[in-house]
């Protein structure tokens, strides 16, 4: 195919605060739409847990000032202390239960949200045009499903609840501190300001590196995927050392960004802890001085102990929030990549002409039917009067002065004009980059043309729904892709409602039945690893069977016999000949001997048709085709 190189991943700029807020808002919208009540229950559990913590801290004031002092003076007994602690014990037990329920709920919310996001990702990915997959590394896309989605799981199930828990705790503890001593509370806020400024600075430094880390991780995964797919090519050309060198460069970029991100992130915890200790010491010193100076009037011993406990409960959530900032920033970087994929425009389709099962009356009238009759027709609605007309599908394809380029800057097909009559075999030959595969990509509308018209049975293909257009076209490719499943499942992929008998009949037509029955479990043999336990020729025979079971009126055979031995090629060719019988067929082949019997051979060079005619006519012209054929040149 003529086109630009696939990119492993574009550089990711540092996200602004506004962009981070937008992504977080969008993510939480997904959570609220699916798990609103569970999330509300989580908030309630957080409030209960925070309340239990505060009650525990404030009880220390009464413990020292009322009960310990009272027991020493003889005004209180141990029984009074036990009675006072029983309600506290119930509150603390309730806090433990609430914390447990919160954890269970967030696991459910987190995993459920990931299920929703993965489903949305895959559903949307299936709607994307081929252009997207031609220009994006498959490994990078896989990294979105694995690494980026997993960071979102951690964000939803851990980071966000922790931040909410810390925020609620801070607010509740603040009012408890204010109730205890407003003077000491102001002092704590002043000390907290320095802690927040230091945390914000460090989070800013680490944030940009976390974004780069996610992007570099996608590039590494993309490179690994490419090397795994092309491992045979790597070994044939002894490219192992170069591949290791390239991987080392990408891996070093990942290490550098991860090191920088974690270097600053890991500094946050110790700094916050030390600042919290300093705040505790200063508050203890000032509180002690205040208690001594006022004789316990403004700050009793119990009130001081309670305040210091609250101060610890106040600074600890702040420290937790700053520590979670790194996870949040990294998760938001992953979320941006997830949403970038979800925001990719789906494949546009303005077609309205449908392909339907039909039957023909003796007078030639075509009517639609729900039964599979072997006769197909185009259903053409007319908006002017609301009527519907039917035209029998015959398989005629016309190119009328077609120009096309994968990018607006570069046209790769120039003024392509041709006509394939129903049932004809049209062959494309030419050198690498001549435009042969590009033409077939235009027939099934993997790409849309910039100029000219393509008609299918005299209908502009832009008016035909893409799904119906592609249903009418069978494809057999050189690089046959088989899916994990049985042989029967892989044949049935051509038509999901096909019976076992129909699949076996298609295999017989493709000359595949004989080798299939010799497999360990015959048609029920499980294929894995893209059919790695089959030969290239056997895989192509299955591909032919898959196309045969779909029973399409038109075929595209893209280089289908270029990498198999002569004996297997004979089997494959017989299968293809049986499949092509009565169908309009477009063939691209390396070996010109396979297209000698074509009704018309198109010779392409630099995106232009320079010769056309039958094999004998082109040989007689002694032009480019003659040179390719007599010189045993390979046409790709």
Residue ranges and their predicted role:
Residues 74, 358-636:
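ABC-type nucleotide-binding domain
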Residues 71, 176-190, 260, 264-336, ...:
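Helix-loop-helix
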Residues 36, 130-131, 147-156, 160, ...:
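An intracellular "coupling" helix at the cytosolic face of ABC transporter transmembrane type-1 domains
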Residues 1-53, 68-87, 102-106, 110, ...:
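Membrane-integrated ABC transporters
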Residues 37-98, 178-183, 285, 292-301:
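Transmembrane helix-loop-helix hairpins at lipid-water interfaces of multipass membrane proteins
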Residues 5-15, 111, 119-143, 147-151, ...:
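Short intracellular "coupling" helices and adjacent cytoplasmic loop segments at the cytosolic face
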Residues 25, 44, 98, 146-191, ...:
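Hydrophobic alpha-helical transmembrane segments of ABC transporter permease domains
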Residues 13-21, 45, 52-68, 91-138, ...:
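Juxtamembrane helix-loop junctions of ABC transporter transmembrane domains
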